[in-house]
């Protein structure tokens, strides 16, 4: 636990970078076409690589303030996509053009899908940013 408290931003950056690379591997190497909601989740995750990387490099204690909105938006989108994969009738018109957002290309152990991986990544980043915020408030 002390490692997490000491390196929370570095761990969050590693998660964001891994998620970015994995999404690129899925789409470019494995040729899995991303749906609209996957693109929106990428738009939330990719800036986190830069924000957390720069914040870590500059030792900016406010980095959680900058990164938190991106992580929350990505988490909400991933929850919505998990929901429409479980209940396809609840799909909005946003996914009506191109690849269906209810399509489940990856299904490990019967429940781990690409949006579930995204959800776990965003949730872990939010928890690590919260740890940073607590640490920041204690130092005041």
Curated annotation (Swiss-Prot):
<dbReference type="GO" id="GO:0006457">
    <property type="term" value="P:protein folding"/>
</dbReference>
<feature type="transmembrane region" description="Helical">
    <location>
        <begin position="6"/>
        <end position="25"/>
    </location>
</feature>
<keyword id="KW-0813">Transport</keyword>
<feature type="transmembrane region" description="Helical">
    <location>
        <begin position="40"/>
        <end position="59"/>
    </location>
</feature>
<keyword id="KW-0143">Chaperone</keyword>
<feature type="disulfide bond" description="Redox-active">
    <location>
        <begin position="35"/>
        <end position="38"/>
    </location>
</feature>
<dbReference type="InterPro" id="IPR003752">
    <property type="entry name" value="DiS_bond_form_DsbB/BdbC"/>
</dbReference>
<comment type="function">
    <text>Required for disulfide bond formation in some proteins.</text>
</comment>
<keyword id="KW-1133">Transmembrane helix</keyword>
<keyword id="KW-1015">Disulfide bond</keyword>
<feature type="transmembrane region" description="Helical">
    <location>
        <begin position="66"/>
        <end position="83"/>
    </location>
</feature>
<keyword id="KW-1003">Cell membrane</keyword>
<comment type="similarity">
    <text>Belongs to the DsbB family. BdbC subfamily.</text>
</comment>
<dbReference type="InterPro" id="IPR012187">
    <property type="entry name" value="Disulphide_bond_form_BdbC"/>
</dbReference>
<keyword id="KW-0614">Plasmid</keyword>
<protein>
    <recommendedName>
        <fullName>Probable disulfide formation protein C 2</fullName>
    </recommendedName>
</protein>
<feature type="disulfide bond" description="Redox-active">
    <location>
        <begin position="95"/>
        <end position="101"/>
    </location>
</feature>
<dbReference type="GO" id="GO:0005886">
    <property type="term" value="C:plasma membrane"/>
</dbReference>
<keyword id="KW-0472">Membrane</keyword>
<feature type="transmembrane region" description="Helical">
    <location>
        <begin position="110"/>
        <end position="134"/>
    </location>
</feature>
<keyword id="KW-0560">Oxidoreductase</keyword>
<dbReference type="Pfam" id="PF02600">
    <property type="entry name" value="DsbB"/>
</dbReference>
<dbReference type="InterPro" id="IPR023380">
    <property type="entry name" value="DsbB-like_sf"/>
</dbReference>
<keyword id="KW-0812">Transmembrane</keyword>
<keyword id="KW-0676">Redox-active center</keyword>
<dbReference type="GO" id="GO:0015035">
    <property type="term" value="F:protein-disulfide reductase activity"/>
</dbReference>
<keyword id="KW-0249">Electron transport</keyword>
């Amino acid at each position: 636990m002390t490692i997490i408290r000491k390196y929370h931003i570095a761990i969050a950056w590693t998660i964001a970078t891994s998620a970015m690379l994995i999404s690129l591997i899925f789409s470019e190497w494995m040729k899995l076409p991303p749906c609209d909601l996957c693109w929106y989740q990428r738009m939330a995750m990719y800036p986190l690589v830069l924000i957390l990387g720069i914040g870590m490099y500059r030792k900016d204690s406010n980095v959680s303030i900058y990164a938190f909105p991106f992580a929350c938006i990505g988490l909400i989108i991933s929850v919505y996509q998990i929901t429409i994969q479980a209940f396809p009738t609840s799909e909005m018109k946003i996914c009506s053009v191109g690849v269906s957002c209810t399509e489940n290309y990856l299904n490990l152990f019967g429940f781990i899908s690409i949006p579930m991986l995204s959800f776990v990544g965003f949730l872990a980043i939010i928890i690590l940013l919260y740890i940073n915020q607590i640490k920041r408030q204690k130092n005041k």
